[in-house]
Structure formats: C-alpha cells, structure tokens
C-alpha cells in the first residue's frame, strides 16, 4: 500500500510539472516533503535516509558550472560568438543552420542548454528574418545540437552530472565514451535536415523590407575583465577535471570551488545571485533525489530491475539496450534530468563485458535521444518557443512573414524530433552493442 501511494505521489508531482512547467522546483520540493512524511509515518523512509539519497556531488557540479557559465555569459562572449558565426553564414539558409548549430554545440559542451539557447536563438531570429529564411528549422536544429553538446561532456548538462555521481565517472570517461557518438549523431542531424529541408528556396519567407533596413545584427559588448576571469577559471577547472581521476578527487568538488571563485569575481547583483548559482536547479534536483530515494525504499526500482532481468533473460547487453530505449520514451514526458535520476540506480546493476561503462553510455544516449524528440523533453524547448513568440510579438511587422513559414508548435517540433530520436536510438544501439561486446 505504501509503495502504491509513493508511486502515485511521484506521478502526480510530475503531472503537475508537465501541466505547469514554471515553479517545477517548488512542486518537486513539495512532493519530496510529502514522501518523507509518508515514509516516516510508515517507517519505510526516514529523514536520514532522504538525506543519504541525495547526490551532493551532482549539486556541487550544478552549482559550479552554473556559476562559471553565468560569468562567461555576463561577459558577453557567447552572444559575440553567436553574432560572429551568423555573419559568417552570409545569409545562406543551409549555412545559417549548420554554423549556428555548430556554435550551439560548442557552447553546450560547457554550459547548460538553457544558457546556450537564451544566447543563440535571439541572434538566429534576427539573422533569419533579415535574410528572409524561415527560422523554425534552424531553431529546431539548435535545440538538438544543444542536447548533443550537453551530452558530450560531464559538465554540459544535468543528466550527465547525475550519471557522473551515480557511476563514479570522470570527465575523461565522458570524452571517450560520449563525445565520439554525439559527434557522429551531429553529422547525421545535418544530413537529416538537408534531406528534410531540401531546397532552401522553399524556406524563404516575405519580410517587410523596412524592418530589414532598420534591424541590424548587433555585436554584444564584451566585458574583458569578466571574460579574462571566466576563461581562466574555466580552463583551470577543465584541467582539474581532467586530472581528477589520477588525483583521486571527485569532479564535483573541483567544480564547486571554481563556482565559488566565479561568484566572487562576477559582479553579480543581489537579485542575480540565486540564478547565477543555479539555485532553482539545485532545489529541483535535491528534491528529485529525495523522491527517487523514496521509490527505492519501497522496492519499486528493485521491481523494475527484476522485470528487466526477466524480459531480457539475464543478458546484460540486451538489458542495457532496452534501458536506453525505455529512458528515451520516459524522457519525452519528464525531461532528461528526471530520467537520469530514476534510471541511474538501474544502470548501476548492469555488469557488461567489454567497456564496463557501456551501461552508463546507453542510459545517457537514451536520455539524449528522448530529449530531442519533443519540446517537453528538451531542457530548453519551452524557452526557445517563448523566445520565438516573444520576438514576433515585439515586431508585429513580421507577423505575416512568420505565418508564411513553419509554425513553431509542439506538433511541428515532433515532426522533426521524433524521426531523429528513432535514428539516434538505432545508431546508439549499434554503438552500445559494439562497446559491450
């Protein structure tokens, strides 16, 4: 009975989040509190157990990388890179998509996709409307590139930070295990968009010439002091992460110290501090870990492991691949961070021949594929949609041009993202089968 109630509270919490995305950290904290109360009354989940279920290293990673990313973003270098890349595309639709997706991938290697999309999408909208190119395919490609970039490294986005803590993985492990696969999938993404988009002349939209003459691509002013501090802290952090394994130091605490330094030097205003240190994300994942701990305490995750073993007849390689596909499906609805927290204990039970870390890469690739399938799964999907609609509202003279192109809706995104998820999963299945062989 307690297990049923625990599962019901977990599902209800994420139903609320799915319906009202804003304030998701408050919903998770409330759900965590309810589960701790239920567990305490029933004797199945005490406050001590709740604290022990939290991956504090993941929270340290989130804090540190959020602070470093905020410092670099505040310096203006990300916006400058995006504007420079857009200008190099020379107004050609195909090159706008490729180059903006590449810069998105590059920034996402070290910054979470929310920061990346917040910087890149406004530049993309200005460039596309100025050149009469439908921006929707380009923005969709950028969201997918952000997911791939975040999945390539340990510090790129939240799911990998969780898996790093759960699997005791290091920075170099992700470079060797995830980056090659993600680079291949990025190349496949470009081929897919070239095939689907075809003739870019069909993507041309009629734009008010008066708006084009008045709207220029603006380079962001760079604060060289903040940029210098940000780059020094970032490169020292990366060196520390690379050496963390040989030095037997956990990466999260290196990132934590770097984050404290970034906050001290970043000139953040009082109202910016909470956001700069990833406050909402830390609260969300802290509460999420407590909720997943409650599921574990009542045996729900043990049941899931037993079910997987039964379905796959004890073949760990098949189990890892099935886990990857399951994680992709769940991620579409609850997002990558939640899937990572829920499935990490399951991945920890897999013992594969060949690359012993292949189970973690299977889970990471499944989460990445699911994140690409729908806006609800993509960390920055809702932000990109809001930026698009806000841009058109601020420039009503572009309404007819926007109406002539693709409409940036959940349904339109799925038309691109869902087939890509299938392609990613098929290729990732081959990759994991080879690694685990």
UniProtKB/Swiss-Prot annotation:
Induction: Part of the probable 17 gene mamAB operon. It is found in: Magnetosome membrane. GO terms for cellular component: magnetosome membrane. Its main location: membrane. The chain crosses the membrane at residues 26-46, 53-73, 95-115, 136-156, 174-194, 229-249, 252-268, 281-301, 320-340, 358-378, 416-436. GO terms for biological process: monoatomic ion transport; transmembrane transport. This bacteria makes up to 60 cubo-octahedral magnetosomes of about 45 nm in diameter which contain membrane-bound crystals of magnetite (Fe(3)O(4)). This is Magnetosome protein MamN. It comes from Magnetospirillum gryphiswaldense (strain DSM 6361 / JCM 21280 / NBRC 15271 / MSR-1). The lineage of its organism: Bacteria, Pseudomonadati, Pseudomonadota, Alphaproteobacteria, Rhodospirillales.
